């Protein structure tokens, strides 16, 4: 995964959000914008749902534009931008994600769609940081349960990093484990379980 790239999320991830008590109602394989990698946790990214403006009414678009001008947290909920066409970034519907839950790159005109406009990226990142700050003050405030989802993904990452050698199940590791247990017995040390 790369920052500022667009991806499709897996059904497994949508199911995970629901299992954790959150809501994610869009199963249409719309692209999500992979905005930034977490500053503290490697391989954890912050993604933002996107949608096409074509099916929005002029009244809905005007309402979103008005919200964008507000100084309150509502001003960070959405961003109207442009990639290969006008797009709505639903920033308040952001979520953490890992590579495990990406089903593929979002392809447009035969290539992986990547946002390259630095001004757009800056505005989106600022709004994302506002939403994440608000979430830190009010955990699970947003319908997708950002905090709970992040905690779950962090625990998955930690488990992957600390997989005991016994879990790797290869012939080489079986021999290594047997030798380790023999050495521990000779030294009178009880092997860890």
Annotated model-derived regions:
Residues 10, 51, 98:
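Residues at the C-termini of beta-strands that transition into short coil/loop
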Residues 27-29, 38-82:
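Compact nucleic-acid interaction/catalytic patches
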Residues 3-6, 44, 88:
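A residue-level signal for beta-strand positions that form part of recognition/binding surfaces
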Residues 13, 54, 101:
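Residue-level detector of flexible, active-site-proximal loop/helix-junction positions
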